[in-house]
Amino acid sequence: KLRREWVKDKKPEEALKACQIFCENADLTGAGVIIPGVNDGDVLRQTCNTLEEWGAKGFILMRFANTFNEGLILGNEPILKGIESQPVEEFGQLVEEINKEYNFRVTGTPLCDPETGGPFAIAKDENEIFLQFIKKVTGEATIITSKIAAPFISKIFDKIDADNVNVIGVPKEIACLITKEDLEQIDLSEVKQAVIIPGRAFVHQLDAERILSADGVERIVGRGPDTLTIDGELSFDKTDENVIEEELTQFNDLVDAINFFGMRI
């Protein structure tokens, strides 16, 4: 019934039968967009019970996005009127709960991966020992990122005593979906002369330079790595060691960008 109504699947029984066949004969990781009041709660548990019974390898929970700040950047929001997405922290708790309740691997996007500690596993206190492998920060810069990523990135740079780096989180929740509208909301008095924006931000370089220099201060705008961690969509077959190693590589690339664009003379 849910597939017929929400996915417009003309033959939902056949789709579920195919899912069962794949579960029983291959390593299948399913994915579901969790819409509050539609397929969460008891419905979600029923889905998980069925997947576990069929022998699924894993399940990726995907938080429903319904606003511009949640990632709908094409002016087509809301997708569903009258439905509010779960708060990010509450969604992360849901992922943790489902992972504990079932025998298959459960991850979530944008949060979290209970098995690896991601995203930003190196921000966790128990992983602080790995921060010694991040290069020394010699430059001075402002990092612009998403609302979700900002606290994690700030914590990491605080722990490595990078006093000349500050982190600004825009209201957009996903860093690679940052647009020029997000940059226009930034208080430029908090922005240093060198700025690092996400590598995959949806902002033209000329727009970024114009917007971030609108107060008369000509700023250098560089791009950091495409990613700084491994999202739950990609980490479901990773170990905690894999994630930490990847994050260290990406943060060293970020430090390289800071030291280059924010070189102090």
Across the structure, where does each feature detected by a protein language model lie?
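Conserved AdoMet/S-adenosylmethionine-binding subsite of the radical SAM
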Residues: 1-71
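Auxiliary Fe-S-binding modules of radical SAM enzymes
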Residues: 45-265
